[in-house]
């Protein structure tokens, strides 16, 4: 399936010089969404996975759909201040300043899911957060990997993705 044809390029958004990869058309296509849920993690033995952890906000959509497809639980990795206590928090650097994400503490094996991997800062923070909160990270997966911006790996494996730019 040609997923790239379902990802809209939005030039100069959110600021000049940036090409935003809008996955809204893909999400509106039930066949494509099902394809993503069934094929993004073909390399992962899901029998040991308890949860799909989605990074706010577009990672929620993919992770929740994958969790339902594979009959697993869903964990929301949220911006700080959005979840009731207790939570664990991790700070990470942004282009201008810092951000915090949080997750309830717990146990189990997770696959972390997000829509786009750019520099890897948010994804690395999500990995660190899951470990801090008591979870074991089995794998990480993104729909789109902007490979020209990162060479990120996890446990000596490339981050799973279905679309690369």
Curated annotation (Swiss-Prot):
The keyword Lipid metabolism does not apply. GO terms for molecular function: adenine binding; adenine phosphoribosyltransferase activity; AMP binding. Catalyzes a salvage reaction resulting in the formation of AMP, that is energically less costly than de novo synthesis. The keyword Translocase does not apply. One of its GO terms (biological process) is AMP salvage. InterPro entries: Ade_phspho_trans, PRibTrfase_dom, PRTase-like, UPRTase/APRTase. Its EC number is 2.4.2.7. Keywords: Cytoplasm, Glycosyltransferase, Purine salvage, Transferase. Transmembrane segments: none annotated. It comes from the Bacteria. This is Adenine phosphoribosyltransferase. Pathway: Purine metabolism; AMP biosynthesis via salvage pathway; AMP from adenine: step 1/1. Belongs to the purine/pyrimidine phosphoribosyltransferase family. It is an enzyme of class 2 (transferase). It catalyses: AMP + diphosphate = 5-phospho-alpha-D-ribose 1-diphosphate + adenine. GO terms for cellular component: cytoplasm. Homodimer. CDD domains: PRTases_typeI. SUPFAM superfamilies: PRTase-like (SSF53271). It is found in: Cytoplasm.
